[in-house]
Amino acid sequence: SYEKAGDQTREIYDILKDSSYKTEQFSKEAIERLNANIVEKEGKNGKKFCFVKCLVRQKEIQLKPEEVIRQLFLDKLINEYGYPISRMQLEYPVYFGREVKRADIVIMDEDRSFVPYVIVEVKKPKLKDGKEQLKSYCNSTGAPIAVWTNGEQIAYFNRKDPNYFEDIRDIPKASQTLMDVISERWTIEDLKANDVLQKDKISLKDKIKDLEDE
């Protein structure tokens, strides 16, 4: 039965309830904007499906759990970080020899519109899997910034070199540069002082393990 989960609406709750995705990282306003644009359609078997007009692709997309998170993160990029839709690409092709994979969200460089600047991963609900995926994408494209989120937890990375991803506190807003937000390597004291564990919903155990894995 539906019990309001945070700021989730019934429609979004129903889509996410059997998944590993949550909406804690997103504002009430963003969730309300997404919900206002949801259209229900009935399939041949009478089952109802939710669709929404994609903020970037400008066409109707079925709202599966990972698509809910993607649309909410796009809203965040537009309304909180100030990135124009013109700099965003979805399902961006990343080449590994003959193999082609698709990055969920890519923000292109402001001055070089063909160069990836930020890559966002929402389809891997676990941090370790998402980070590995992002490492491969950034190494292939040269993108310096990566973000992983499942809607409950979020992590930001700066690709220092192919073998080292440094945690950063956030990604730059459209008006900022990477150097404006880049920080020294995290310490446990940093984490406590900045309350990052609570904000990002990542456990101390996971964060320490992540630091040790680098």
Language model feature labels by segment:
Residues 1-145, 152-214:
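A short, conserved, highly charged catalytic patch centered on acidic carboxylates
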